[in-house]
Amino acid sequence: MIELWPAIDLIGSTSVRLTEGKYDSEEKMSRSAEESIAYYSQFECVNRIHIVDLIGAKAQHAREFDYIKSLRRLTTKDIEVGGGIRTKSQIMDYFAAGINYCIVGTKGIQDTDWLKEMAHTFPGRIYLSVDAYGEDIKVNGWEEDTELNLFSFVRRLSDIPLGGIIYTDIAKDGKMSGPNFELTGQLVKATTIPVIASGGIRHQQDIQRLASLNVHAAIIGKAAHQASFWEGLK
C-alpha cells in the first residue's frame, strides 16, 4: 500500500505553498502549521508528516529548527524534515529533537561521499530529495542548475542505504495538474531505492495511479488542505 505524507512548507514559521518552487509565488495556507499537524494527525492513513524549511533550503542553513522542534511535540505521527540540512551535527540535532527522518538535497547531490557517510551512520533515516525540471536536477532551493541527469545520478546511488529518494518534478509542483507519471515510473524502474513522489498530486485517482507504478509514498501539498482529498479515507 502506498504511504501518504502530507506536507507543511514553512517560511517565517508560516505555512505556505510555492508554485514551481518560485519564492515570489508564496501563498499562505488557510491552516497554520499547528492546525495542519492536528488535522493530518486524525487520519490513520497518514504515515508521516513532511516538513520543509523553505528559507533554509534557499539560505543553505536550517532556519526553522526551534519552531519545528515545537511542532514535533504536537503529534505522535512520524515527522521528516528537510531544508538547509548540510551537516552531520544538524542531522543529529533534529534526531535529538525527536524528528524521525531527515531529508538532504543540495549537499547530498553535490557530495555523494558525505551522503554515503550519513546514510551508513543513520541507515534508513536519511532521504535524498532530487528535484528536477524534466531530467535536469536543480539545487539550492531549485534555483541553480547542476548539469546532472536525473537517471544517471540516481543509478549511482544503488549501494547507499537511503530511506528513499524524494522525486519532485518542479514543473508540476504547486500546480494541482497531476504528477509526472511517466518520469516517476521510469525512476522506480531505474533504482532499487524506494521512490517517493512529490509535486502536482490532486486526488485519490493520482494516488492510485502512483501506487500502480510501485511508488513507495506520495507527498501531498496543496491537495492535503482540501477536505475533498480525504473523503473516504480514515
Curated annotation (Swiss-Prot):
Cross-referenced CDD domains, in alphabetical order?
HisA
Give the UniProt entry's GO cellular component terms: cytoplasm
Q: EC number(s) of the enzyme? A: 5.3.1.16
Reactions catalysed: 1-(5-phospho-beta-D-ribosyl)-5-[(5-phospho-beta-D-ribosylamino)methylideneamino]imidazole-4-carboxamide = 5-[(5-phospho-1-deoxy-D-ribulos-1-ylimino)methylamino]-1-(5-phospho-beta-D-ribosyl)imidazole-4-carboxamide
Pathway(s) it belongs to? Amino-acid biosynthesis; L-histidine biosynthesis; L-histidine from 5-phospho-alpha-D-ribose 1-diphosphate: step 4/9
Q: Give a Pfam family name.
A: His_biosynth
Question: Which key words are in the record?
Answer: Amino-acid biosynthesis, Cytoplasm, Histidine biosynthesis, Isomerase
For this protein, the record's SUPFAM superfamilies field holds: Ribulose-phoshate binding barrel
Q: Which residues form the active site?
A: D9, D131
Any one GO molecular-function label of the UniProt entry = 1-(5-phosphoribosyl)-5-[(5-phosphoribosylamino)methylideneamino]imidazole-4-carboxamide isomerase activity
Q: What Gene Ontology terms for biological process does this UniProt record contain?
A: L-histidine biosynthetic process; L-tryptophan biosynthetic process
Family membership, please give it: Belongs to the HisA/HisF family.
What the entry lists under PANTHER family is as follows: 1-(5-PHOSPHORIBOSYL)-5-[(5-PHOSPHORIBOSYLAMINO)METHYLIDENEAMINO] IMIDAZOLE-4-CARBOXAMIDE ISOMERASE
Protein name per its UniProtKB record? 1-(5-phosphoribosyl)-5-[(5-phosphoribosylamino)methylideneamino] imidazole-4-carboxamide isomerase
Q: Which organism is it from?
A: Staphylococcus aureus (strain Newman)
